[in-house]
Regions:
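Active-site surface patch of divalent metal-dependent phosphodiester/phosphate bond hydrolases
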Residues: 1-37, 47, 144-154
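Active-site metal-binding loops of divalent metal-dependent hydrolases
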Residues: 58, 117-118
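Stable alpha-helical elements in mature extracytoplasmic
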Residues: 1, 22, 92-100, 140-144
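Metal-dependent phosphoester-hydrolase catalytic domains
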Residues: 35-38, 44, 103-113, 119-238
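Surface-exposed cleft-lining segments at the edges of enzyme active sites
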Residues: 77-94, 131-133
Length: 238
C-alpha cells in the first residue's frame, strides 16, 4: 500500500492510467510537482537537478503479436493483415499516447524518462533482420512507440545499449509462457536526455541467465506473481 511505501521513507505517486488501472512511481527522492494528466512526477535529486519520470500501462488488448502469430484473443482475429493490426492497436492505445505527449510537452526539464508495460512491441524490434532470423513473422512499425517517437520521445534505452534486435531481442514477455505464447519486448524505458546525461545500462531482470541479464534470486516463489520480466535502466549525470 502507499502507506507501507511511505513508512519506508519513500515517496509514491499513483495515477489512474487513463482509467485502465493504477500505475505508481516510487522514489527515494521527493517530488516537486505532478504533470497535468498525472502520468509523471518531477523528482528533485538535489544540487539543482530535477527530472521528470513518467509511467504507463498500455491496454492489454488487442494484442498485435497474437494476431500476427495466428492467435485469436479478446474477439480480435488472427490475421496476416499488418495494416489492420497496426490500425486496431493504435486505436486501442492512442488515447494514452496523446495524454503522455501532452505531459511530455509540458515538461519544465529536458530529462524525461517514460517507463511502462506497453503491451505492444517497440517499433525498433520487428525489423527485416528480425524477420529473417525468425524472431518476428512480419516487419511492423508498432504504432504506440512510433507515435511517441514522432512526438519527441526518441530514446529507447534497451535499443540504445543493444541496437540489434536479433542478437539482443530483450524479451520481457513472458517468464511463464504456454506452448502457444509469443516472446516479445513489451516493457520499455523511453527517454529524452539533458546535455549532461547518458544511458549507462539497461538490463532485463528475470528467472534465469538464458533470458535475463540479472537473475532475481529465489525466483520460485514469484513464478505465479510475475508474468513479465523486469527492466533496470541506469542513467548517469555528469
Amino acid at each position: 500500500s502507499e502507506s507501507d511505501i511511505q513508512a519506508q521513507g519513500l515517496y509514491v505517486h499513483t495515477h489512474s492510467n487513463n482509467g485502465q488501472g493504477k500505475c505508481s512511481i516510487i522514489s527515494r527522492y521527493p517530488f516537486s510537482g505532478i504533470t497535468p494528466n498525472k502520468y509523471g512526477a518531477y523528482i528533485d535529486l538535489g544540487e539543482g537537478i530535477v527530472v521528470l519520470v513518467m509511467n504507463c500501462h498500455g491496454a492489454y488488448f488487442p494484442y498485435g503479436p497474437y494476431q500476427l502469430n495466428g492467435i485469436e484473443y479478446k474477439d480480435f482475429p488472427a490475421t496476416d493483415d499488418v495494416d489492420y493490426v497496426v490500425k486496431v492497436n493504435k486505436e486501442a492505445r492512442q488515447g494514452m499516447v496523446d495524454k503522455l505527449l501532452e505531459d511530455f510537452h509540458s515538461s519544465t526539464t529536458p530529462f524525461v524518462c517514460l517507463s511502462g508495460d506497453f503491451n505492444e512491441p517497440s517499433w525498433l524490434d520487428w525489423t527485416e533482420g528480425a524477420l529473417s532470423a525468425g524472431l518476428a513473422p512480419y516487419v511492423v512499425q508498432w504504432p504506440t512507440t512510433r507515435s511517441l517517437w514522432e512526438g519527441g520521445i526518441k530514446g529507447d534505452a534497451y535499443r540504445t545499449i543493444h541496437p540489434d534486435p536479433v542478437t539482443h531481442p530483450g524479451f520481457t514477455w513472458t517468464p511463464r509462457p504456454s506452448k502457444k505464447d509469443t516472446k516479445d519486448r513489451l516493457d520499455l524505458t523511453l527517454y529524452t536526455l539533458s546535455p549532461n546525461t547518458e544511458v549507462k545500462s539497461c538490463q532485463v531482470i528475470g528467472e534465469n541467465t538464458e533470458m535475463s541479464d540479472i537473475v532475481l534470486p529465489n525466483w520460485g516463489p514469484f513464478e505465479n506473481v510475475f508474468d513479465h520480466r523486469g527492466l533496470r535502466t541506469e542513467f548517469v549525470f555528469t
